[in-house]
Amino acid sequence: MVAAGGAVELLRVLPHRGRGRRELPGMTAVRLEGYRLRAAAADPARDLAAVAALGGRLVCPGDREWPSQLDDLGDARPVALWVRGRADLRLWALRSVAVVGARACTPYGAHMAATLGAGLAERGWVVVSGAAFGVDGAAHRGVLAVGGATAAVLACGVDVPYPRGHAELIGRVAQQGLVIAELPPGGHPTRARFVLRNRVIAALTRGTVVVEAEYRSGSLVTARQAQRLGRFVMGVPGPATSGLSAGVHELLRGEGVLVTEASEVAELIGEIGDLAPDRRGPVLPRDRLDPIAAKVLDALPYHGLTSTRELARGAGTSADETLGRLYELHSLGFVEREGDGWRLTRPSPRDGAVRRGGS
C-alpha cells in the first residue's frame, strides 16, 4: 500500500470509510477495513516515546543511519526500522554476516554456530541472527563471549523479549550490540511476521550461513531470499543421516558454498586478502626426511630383510649413499639392521611415520 500511494497518501485516505479503494487500486474492502482498524490503534508519539525510553530510535529510508542495501528489496523494503542499541546501524550492516539455523538444533549445530559467531566477531564482522532458540541463540552467545558485535532482528517489537526464554540474551545483545525490528514497540510476533523478518536479515547482510536446517525451514527461506538478492549463501555440512542437515545439504548441492569455520566465511564475503589459511595435515617425522632418505625408505618392503645393494637398486642411488641413509634412518627409528640385511622397524612408530605400501 505504501509503495502504491506513499505513506502520506495512505494516512490521508485510511481514516475515511468512503475512500481508499479508488485511490488504492487492487485493494479489497475487507483488507482495507483491516488496515483502517490497525491505523486507528496506532499512536506514533507513544511508540517513539517507548523506544526512546529504551535508548532506541526509529530509522527511516533517507536517514543517515539507513542501510541502503535494504533498498534492494524494492517494494518489499521496510517502511522503517526500530533500533535499540548504541551502534550505528548503517556502518554495522556494511560488514555483517547472518548465521541462522534450526531451533531444535543438535549439540553439534550449537557448537558450530557459537564457534562461527565467535570467530567472525574476532575478525571484525557483525554477526546478525534472529535471537531464536537453537542456532540463532548459540551464534549470539558465541559473539558475546568474545566481546564482539552482534545484532538481533526480531519478528516483534524491540521491547518484546521473544522467545521469553531469551529475555536475558536479548537484553545482553541490546547492551553490546543492536536489536532491530519492523514492528513498533509492543508488537507481538506471528507466523507471517517471521517470514517478513527473514527478508530483512537476508538483505541487511553480505551473506547468510545456514547451520542445520530441515527441508522445510525458515532458515532456508532466508538463504533463498539472500540468493535472490545476490548475497553470498553458505552452509555448514552435517552428518548425511541427520534430518537436521538435509536442508543444508540440499542448499550445498545448488548455489550454496560449503564452509566449516569463520576464516572460510570471511574469505568468501570479505575484501581481497581475507584468505583462509592453507589446509595441512600434521607434520610427521617422515615429512622431515630429505628426498634421498625418503627414496631409500620407500624401497624397503613391508616384510623381510633386504640387502643394501637391493635397496640401492630400488632407490636409484649408489650403495654408499644408500648405506649412509640407512644409518640415518636407523638413528631415527625407521629401520633396523639384522646381519647384512635391513628391515622396517616393527612395530611401526605410533605417529604413522613409517612408509605405507611397498613390495
Model-derived regions, located:
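N-terminal positively charged helical leader segments and presequences
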Residues: 1-79
